[in-house]
Amino acid sequence: MPAASAIHTLIVDDQASMRALIRTSMQALGFREFREAGDGEAGLREMITRPAHLIISDFNMPNLDGLGLLRAVRAHPPTAGAAFIMLTGRADRELVQRAVQFGVNNYLVKPFTVAQLKDKVEGVFGPLT
């Protein structure tokens, strides 16, 4: 059982309000280490500079979307093992299937509750302490 406070998280979303909501939700679950990026390109730079244990990324973003970020993270050996949860505003089966093909660990449809986020994170890491 990992301690939530030990999991370094990268939040990638082009909306600052959504990044704040994710951060606040994660803090409620005991997470303490965060970095943020406003698009996939910035998220990839963050991951290359200092890899995170968990990436929570929006799908629909400018410059490099969430699927492009996922593919780039999985292709780069130092970051390939990071857990990746994709956020999407639409429950699109084709999108989910494509993300699974590229190695997404879980996905979450917006809007979401803290309990739903917890379920998705625990689906990747197991029960949190």
Model-derived regions: residue spans:
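Alpha4 helix (beta4-alpha4-beta5 surface) of REC/receiver domains from two-component response regulators
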Residues: 23, 68, 91-106
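Active-site beta3 strand of CheY-like receiver
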Residues: 50-56
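Short amphipathic alpha-helix used as the core "switch/output" element in two-component signaling
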Residues: 45, 67-80
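Receiver (REC) domain active-site loop signature in two-component systems and cognate sites
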Residues: 61
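C-terminal output helix
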Residues: 94, 112-121
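Helix N-cap/capping motif at the beta->alpha junctions
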Residues: 36-45, 66
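Two-component/phosphorelay signaling modules centered on CheY-like receiver
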Residues: 16-35, 102
